[in-house]
């Protein structure tokens, strides 16, 4: 039988540092919002969005003014991969918008994304 008393207490105080952000009473510029709806939102749907629905939704997010958009998880399905290809091939990503993808940290998967 294992006994819990063999473990030392695990409390570690936070390091002392100057937290200037915590002392501010206002923000000086607006935050940058990143939409993750195309990835996280799509995973929660019973029937995931089609390629055309994803393209329409991406255009809508751009129209709303998002400057950072997580576009998907291309290694998860062919639809996700084709969606990313369509964004690139159809030049749908505006110059002032940054897109990101979610992926596993595996060489062959990362390399396949680089070559999209």
Describe each region flagged by the PLM.
Residues 1-21:
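Intrinsic disorder at enzyme termini
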Residues 23-46:
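N-terminal small/glycine-rich loop or linker at the start of catalytic domains
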Residues 33-36, 69-71, 95-103:
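Hydrophobic faces of well-ordered beta-strands that scaffold small-molecule active sites
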Residues 56-72:
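Catalytic domains of carbohydrate-active enzymes, especially glycoside hydrolases
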Residues 67-89:
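Glycine-rich, proline-tolerant flexible connector loops at the mouths of alpha/beta enzymes
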Residues 74-76, 102-108:
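Active-site beta-loop-alpha junctions enriched in small/polar residues
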Residues 114-116:
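Conserved small/polar residues in nucleotide/adenosyl-binding loops
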């Amino acid at each position: 039988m294992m006994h819990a008393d063999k473990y030392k207490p695990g409390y570690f105080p936070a390091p002392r540092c100057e937290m200037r952000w915590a002392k501010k009473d206002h923000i000086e510029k607006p935050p940058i919002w990143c939409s993750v709806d195309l990835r996280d939102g799509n995973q929660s749907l019973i029937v995931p969005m089609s390629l055309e629905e994803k393209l329409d939704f991406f255009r809508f997010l751009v129209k709303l003014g998002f400057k950072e958009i997580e576009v998907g998880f291309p290694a998860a399905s062919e639809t996700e991969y084709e969606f990313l290809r369509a964004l690139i091939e159809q030049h749908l990503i505006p110059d002032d918008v940054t897109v990101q993808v979610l992926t596993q940290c595996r060489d062959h998967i990362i390399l396949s994304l680089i070559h999209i």
